[in-house]
A protein has these predicted regions:
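Hydrophobic secretory-pathway targeting helix
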Residues: 1-22, 232
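Intrinsically disordered, low-complexity Pro/Gly/Ser/Thr-rich segments with frequent PxxP/GP/PP motifs
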Residues: 80-108
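Short beta-strand elements
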Residues: 126-150
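Alpha-helical transmembrane segments forming the membrane-embedded cores
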Residues: 155-250
Length: 250
């Protein structure tokens, strides 16, 4: 049941959360190795040092005090890597400032792999986000990274959920109530959707985002729910007329 609970929790975490109100008058522009963030995929190779440049355009009437530049990657509402670089500078009102720094993601290979949503943001002295820009990152990591291991764990839990539900069906041990039988199959469906989302991400086909995650997870969960609902009552037996007769020779 712990595995089923984890799969249900992962599915719930896919629901889009309310966006925090942000001041749109502060704009962040960033580029990595001369390529603008937000144009195409951002390639992150742990074996190479990247040159990051950020430009903060302050259209407000107050000074913006930047302390940290953060680059993070998330999937399924979980953060799998985050790099904070201290680059303190002030951006006067109605002006812009640019800063550059090297990024050495040497341990990135053990944290993530494949396509992931990446956010570049500038943080003030109060640890609040001033502005951010989002893109899709192509992480050249290992299958045995934290993200890869997470996907393998979800795959194992999903297999166990399906095995438990199907074995209970074969042994006529499912609940007599249709809705309870449907709920018995639901975690397996959620897990199937999560496995599909993670697999597409690792194979660098589709990055995990709400528009990609929700259809897969909801669709697979609905299919499993319907399958469980339509399973026969565990107390049902075949009609005598349907039972095969065997002739005993004397």
């Amino acid at each position: 049941m712990a595995g089923a609970g984890l799969l249900l929790w992962c599915g719930i975490m896919l629901l889009p959360s309310a966006a925090l109100a942000q001041d749109g008058s502060v704009i962040l522009e960033a580029d990595v190795d001369g390529r603008p963030v937000g144009v195409g995929n951002l390639v992150l190779d742990p074996s190479q040092t990247a040159k990051v440049s950020v430009t903060v355009r302050n259209n407000t009437t107050t000074v913006q005090r930047v302390k940290t530049v953060r680059i993070s990657g998330t999937a399924l509402a979980l953060t799998f890597f985050s790099y904070d670089t201290t680059v303190p500078f002030d951006v006067p009102a109605k002006s812009s400032e640019t800063r550059s720094f090297p990024l050495e993601p040497t341990d990135l290979g053990s944290q993530a792999i494949g396509l992931l949503p990446v956010t570049v943001e500038v943080i003030d002295v109060g640890r609040e986000s001033i502005a951010s820009v989002e893109t899709t990152g192509d992480v050249k990591g290992s299958l045995w990274s934290v993200y890869g291991a997470f996907g393998l764990g979800v795959l194992v839990l999903t297999g166990l959920s399906w095995a438990g539900a199907l074995i209970a069906l074969a042994r006529r041990r499912l609940p007599p109530n249709r809705w309870q039988r449907a709920m018995r199959f639901l975690p397996a469906g959620i897990g199937t959707g999560l496995v599909a989302v993670i697999s597409l991400s690792v194979l660098r086909l589709v990055a995990p985002s709400p528009t990609a995650e929700i259809p897969f997870v909801v669709g697979a969960a609905a299919a499993a729910f319907v399958l469980g609902y339509l399973t026969p009552h565990p107390g049902e037996r075949r009609h005598p007329s349907d039972v095969d007769t065997v002739r005993i020779q004397r």
